Amino acid sequence: MAARRRLLLLLVLLLCRLAAVLPTSEVEALQGFMAGFAGGNAAFQSWDASAPNPCTWFHVTCGPGNQVIRLDLGNQSLSGELKPDIWQLQALQSLELYGNSISGKIPSELGRLASLQTLDLYLNNFTGEIPNELGNLSKLSNLRLNNNSLSGAIPMSLTTIQNLEVLDLSHNNLSGIIPTNGSFSHFTPISFSNNPRTFANSSDSPSNNSGAAVPSGRSSASSIGTIAGGAAAGAAMLFAAPIVLFAWWWRRKPHDQFFDLLEEETPEVHLGQLRRFTLRELQVATDNFSQTNLLGRGGFGKVYKGRLLDGSLIAIKRLNEDRIGTGERQFLMEVEIISMAVHQNLLRLQGYCMTPTERLLVYPYMENKSLETRLRECSDSQQPLDWPTRRKIALGSARGISYLHEGCDPKIIHRDVKAANILLDEKLEAVVGDFGLARIMDYKVSHVVTGVMGTLGHIPMEYLTAGRTSDKTDVFGYGIMLFELISGKRGFDLVGLANEENARVHDWVKKLLEEDRLEVLIDPNLLEIYNGGEQGVREEMRLLVQIALLCTQESAPSRPRMSTVVTMLEDGIAEHWDAWQRKTIVQASLQGGQGVSEARNDSVANLPPDTLSGPR
């Protein structure tokens, strides 16, 4: 018995030692990683080298065993170089460094991250070649290196990554042949565009255009004969070339088009690894689009629940007839761009179907449906959303929208951010949906659209009156969605409550906050913990209200970017809130104390319904 106790004690000590060693080595790896960037960056404020465990640091996510599985440092104004120390994070699954100013070469040591699934280094200043070692990342599914200054050939080793689903090497200085074998056979030219020195196959190589040297040591007559023969052959080729080129073009035409527009009955067409379904498959999956499988309807069409032959559940958006007028090429280009918007907080496009009379989009089915459903149509078997879950949903949805604005190329405006379009997965994580047919945002500037799309209570004045949309349109919608999350009420209902006091929603909530009467706004399911003063909860709710107020300001330029909202949710709001309070005081003094009622013209309560789209 004593021997068994000693053995058990030894095992406990060994496990404790192992638990202490793993985080320490990861702390050292992260410190080495951080050392590559210019000092003083706010993203690393919580990265304390003396901490035994990095799992409490901002932008770091840990999995089982307290091992780092994700580094999310996109759009953090990082400058410097990516140090190779990061290879020591052997459990790392996602490395997101997009939208910074990181320079230097991509370390070949990244090829040693055996668990890596997502590598996002796009929109930086990386130079040099793509490391051949990246081909060792057998679990990699998302590789985006676009918008850098990478050069050299595309490594053939990348074609051996069987799990690769998303690839973007565009907007670099790559050269040589674009591989078409292995996993690369699924990708279209958009993945390699804007690399002027690349070509599709060896016959397009510049080296094939150089002339052949004339052999020396021949007689003058032989030379003349050679020249004459060459001239005759050249003349023959001149006449034959158009025929040969036409035959070559005709044979290769289905493969060289930007999108392969095959008939509906040939489902093997893919955009990336996006599946093309037949209409028959989707009819069988939905029992011929029966009403019993109808999940909802909106401005873009109806959504049905379906079950494929392998048993997997899907959600099918059947687009309205007015969308069918979109040309095949235009529709496929939209599908291609949206399919490349891959983020854990975005609804992943799984496939599509296109016929002369139908346009359908296929998504994974979300068992927990939408935030709106959980807030207002909770079944008897479901508990109301608690405060930690709502806080998690606020952060997750902000990350998803921020990625649409700053992580996609071209950028995407959602234009209808609301609780109904925030879906919930099996862990109640936020998944932003229904951005599938949103207008594509210009890379540098906003643009004017011809028709207002959105939902009553979620539309800012600049969009409603002038049709001018930008990323700040989504910021406004997100702010109203936060009010929905806190109150459990629809945006339209909040407009009605504010109108009773002759004010906009923004001004009404601001007044409640200033008068310490937020219990008027807060969901009855949360009032007990709010009034009970549970540690930190009351302050967290006030924080979320403050962020929502910043997002719903009347002036679009004054609203924060979504990446700033993410930072505020993670790090705090004090600096932004104080600056806004000072600005409000100055504006009030300049206006000579004009009443709040003047802002009523920003309300959309009295507009006819036909100026707005329905819920999507």
From Swiss-Prot:
It is found in: Cell membrane. Residues 1-23 form the signal peptide. Residues 24-226 are extracellular. PROSITE patterns: LRR (PS51450), PROTEIN_KINASE_ATP (PS00107), PROTEIN_KINASE_DOM (PS50011), PROTEIN_KINASE_ST (PS00108). The active site is at D416 (proton acceptor). It is an enzyme of class 2 (transferase). The chain crosses the membrane at residues 227-247. Residues 248-616 are cytoplasmic. One of its GO terms (cellular component) is plasma membrane. Residues 594-616 are annotated as: Disordered. Pfam families: LRR_1 (PF00560), LRRNT_2 (PF08263), Pkinase (PF00069). It is a single-pass membrane protein. It catalyses: L-seryl-[protein] + ATP = O-phospho-L-seryl-[protein] + ADP + H(+); L-threonyl-[protein] + ATP = O-phospho-L-threonyl-[protein] + ADP + H(+). Belongs to the protein kinase superfamily. Ser/Thr protein kinase family. PANTHER family: LRR RECEPTOR-LIKE SERINE/THREONINE-PROTEIN KINASE-RELATED (PTHR48056), RECEPTOR PROTEIN-TYROSINE KINASE CEPR1 (PTHR48056:SF81). This is LRR receptor kinase SERK2. The lineage of its organism: Eukaryota, Viridiplantae, Streptophyta, Embryophyta, Tracheophyta.
